[in-house]
C-alpha cells in the first residue's frame, strides 16, 4: 500500500508547526530608530542644561516691540492710485523722492532725540488705508535695501512674488545694517544744524536706504492713502524699570 509518508515524498515540514511570538522578535529598523531616539534625547538634555543660565534673559521676537523707546517722525501723507496687477514706487531715497517740500512738513524744534540717547534701529513704516468705503482687497508690498547708488527704479512694476501687508495694514522695514545699531550721540545738535545733513551723514551712514513698492490684489484700480514715517528705536541708558533680573538691554 502506498504511503504518503514514504521516503520518496518525505518532507521535513510535514507534521511540524512553527509559532513565532512577536514579543521576542523586534524589527531591525525599530531597534535602530529606538537607539537613535535615545541618543538624541541624551544630547538634547545636555544642550538644555548648557542653556539653562540664559533663561533669565528676555529677547523680543519682533525687534520693533523690544526694549527701547519708539519715536515716530512722519515723512509724508499722500493719496496714490494703484492699477490692478501692478505695484507703484512710493519710497526711493536714491532719486529725488524726498528732495522736495515734504522735508519741511516735519522739521520742527521738538525733535524727540536728545543728547543722552542713541539710535538702536530705524524702521521705515508705511501705513496704507483705502479711501473708498466697502472695498474688499489686501495690500501688497515689496522693498529693497542694498540697491546700487546709480540704480534708477521704475515708477510702476508688475506684481511678482509680493508679500501681503500684515496687521493694521502696516508695512514695517528694519533699516539696520548687519552688526546692529547706530551708536551716534549729539543727534539733536546734528538735526537742528541741518536736517538734510542729518539724514545723509548720520542716518544713511549707519542704515540702509530703502526702495518700496506697494500694490493691491484688487481687480480694479484702487485709491490708497499712504502715511510714510521713520520710527527711531531709542536706547534709554536709565530705563524706568528693569525687564527682568538680568540686564535690560
From Swiss-Prot:
<comment type="similarity">
    <text>Belongs to the polyhedrin family.</text>
</comment>
<keyword id="KW-0842">Viral occlusion body</keyword>
<dbReference type="InterPro" id="IPR001746">
    <property type="entry name" value="Polyhedrin"/>
</dbReference>
<protein>
    <recommendedName>
        <fullName>Polyhedrin</fullName>
    </recommendedName>
</protein>
<comment type="function">
    <text>Major component of the virus occlusion bodies, which are large proteinaceous structures (polyhedra), that protect the virus from the outside environment for extended periods until they are ingested by insect larvae.</text>
</comment>
<dbReference type="GO" id="GO:0005198">
    <property type="term" value="F:structural molecule activity"/>
</dbReference>
<dbReference type="Pfam" id="PF00738">
    <property type="entry name" value="Polyhedrin"/>
</dbReference>
<dbReference type="GO" id="GO:0039679">
    <property type="term" value="C:viral occlusion body"/>
</dbReference>
Amino acid at each position: 500500500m502506498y504511503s504518503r509518508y514514504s521516503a520518496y515524498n518525505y518532507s521535513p515540514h510535514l507534521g511540524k508547526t512553527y509559532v513565532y511570538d512577536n514579543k521576542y522578535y523586534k524589527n531591525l529598523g525599530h531597534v535602530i530608530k529606538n537607539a537613535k531616539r535615545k541618543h538624541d534625547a541624551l544630547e538634547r538634555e545636555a544642550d538644555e542644561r548648557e542653556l539653562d543660565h540664559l533663561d533669565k534673559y528676555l529677547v523680543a521676537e519682533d525687534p520693533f516691540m523690544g526694549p527701547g523707546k519708539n519715536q515716530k517722525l512722519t515723512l509724508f501723507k499722500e493719496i496714490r492710485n494703484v492699477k490692478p496687477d501692478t505695484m507703484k514706487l512710493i519710497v526711493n531715497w536714491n532719486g529725488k523722492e524726498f528732495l522736495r517740500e515734504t522735508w519741511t512738513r516735519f522739521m520742527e524744534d521738538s525733535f524727540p532725540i536728545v543728547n543722552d540717547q542713541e539710535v538702536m534701529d530705524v524702521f521705515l513704516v508705511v501705513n496704507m488705508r483705502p479711501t473708498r468705503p466697502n472695498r474688499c482687497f489686501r495690500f501688497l508690498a515689496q522693498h529693497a535695501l542694498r540697491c546700487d547708488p546709480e540704480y534708477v527704479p521704475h515708477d510702476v512694476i508688475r506684481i511678482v512674488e509680493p508679500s501681503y501687508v500684515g496687521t493694521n495694514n502696516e508695512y514695517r522695514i528694519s533699516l539696520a545694517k548687519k552688526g546692529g545699531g547706530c551708536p551716534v550721540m549729539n543727534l539733536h545738535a546734528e538735526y537742528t544744524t541741518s536736517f538734510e545733513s542729518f539724514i545723509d551723514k548720520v542716518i544713511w551712514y549707519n542704515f540702509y536706504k530703502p526702495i518700496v513698492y506697494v500694490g493691491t490684489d484688487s481687480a480694479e484700480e484702487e485709491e490708497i492713502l499712504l502715511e510714510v514715517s521713520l520710527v527711531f528705536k531709542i536706547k534709554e541708558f536709565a530705563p524706568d524699570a528693569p525687564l527682568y533680573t538680568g540686564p535690560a538691554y
